[in-house]
Each structure stands twice: as structure tokens, then as C-alpha cells.
Regions:
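Bulky hydrophobic segments
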Residues: 17-131, 135-170
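Gly/Thr/Ser/Pro-rich low-complexity intrinsically disordered regions
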Residues: 1-22
């Protein structure tokens, strides 16, 4: 377990064990968490990039507005998630990550990770169309990772009005 994980878990006011028979861990959540940890928590990095992109700053109490409350917030979050996961995979590949093959591996890995995440959401009862929209934004973000971070952000600026919003009514 990483230092980040230990610090987070030890600081939690909630008991870290599930009540017997409830919220059983499953293979998808295990894969998602272990991958996130192995890759240096790209989901958290994507969240921070999205906060910066949307101009979200903590209030006087340290609380922050929900990204989904902003126009294009969900779109940006999934785009940045796909972008950041691809970059994190490429970083793990070392010098191979800077090659065309490494970039392709990053894009493919990012999309596999996004699909595992969305499969988990469907299993938890989220609407299928919402996951399809989110996976679309993850895919476009993974392609954005083929460019510099600044260029990728400019691509999001241009495409966000055309991408799905990821907000589906139940």
C-alpha cells in the first residue's frame, strides 16, 4: 500500500471494513484501484486538472464545488481522465512511452481502463447511456494525450460543445 493510501485510509473517520454481506469488493473495483495506485493515481491528477480547467477553487472552509455542477464539467472530467490515464501509462513505460508504440499502448490502456470503470458504474446501477457518453469522452481525451498538455486542453476547448455531456436522466 502506498504512503498516499495509508495516509488517506488512516485519516478516514469511517471504519474501513464493509459490514458482513454488504458492499463486497469485486474484481472490477479491485482492478481499478490497483491500476490507479500502480500508475500514481492518474484519476486524482485528472481531477486536479479538471478543477483548474473549470476554475474551481476551495472556499474559505476548504470545500470545492462539484465538477458536474459546471457546464461541460462532466465532459471535461472524463476527457481529462482519458488524457491523464494515457499519459500515466506512457510514463510507466519509460523510454518506450515516448515512441509511437508507447503512445498507442497509452491510448489503448486508457480506453481499457475507462471501460473497466464504466462497467463498474453500470454494475452499480448507473444508466448505460451515461457510461457510453463517459466512455466517448474518455476516448477523445486519450487521443488528446497524443499532444502536449496545453494542446490537449485547447482541443477540449474546441470540442466540448460537440461532445456528450454525460448527464443522463434515470
Amino acid at each position: 500500500m502506498s504512503k498516499f493510501s495509508k495516509k488517506f485510509i488512516s485519516a478516514s473517520p469511517f471504519k474501513q471494513q464493509d459490514p458482513t454481506g454488504q458492499n463486497q469488493r469485486n474484481i472490477l473495483s479491485d482492478i481499478e484501484y490497483k491500476s490507479d495506485e500502480f500508475l500514481g493515481f492518474p484519476e486524482e491528477k485528472a481531477r486536479q486538472r479538471t478543477d483548474e480547467y473549470l476554475g474551481i477553487k476551495p472556499d474559505k472552509d476548504g470545500l470545492m464545488e462539484d465538477q458536474n455542477s459546471f457546464e461541460h464539467g462532466d465532459t471535461a472530467r472524463h476527457y481529462m481522465g482519458g488524457d491523464q490515464l494515457s499519459r500515466s501509462i506512457r510514463e510507466k513505460l519509460g523510454s518506450l512511452g515516448k515512441t509511437s508504440l508507447g503512445r498507442i499502448i497509452g491510448v489503448i490502456g486508457s480506453n481499457v481502463g475507462g471501460l473497466v470503470h464504466e462497467a463498474q458504474n453500470i454494475k452499480e446501477g448507473r444508466p448505460i447511456l451515461e457510461s457510453v457518453e463517459d466512455a466517448t469522452n474518455n476516448f477523445v481525451g486519450s487521443l488528446g494525450s497524443l499532444f502536449s498538455t496545453n494542446t490537449s486542453t485547447r482541443i477540449l476547448d474546441r470540442l466540448k460543445k460537440y461532445l456528450p455531456d454525460g448527464k443522463v436522466k434515470d
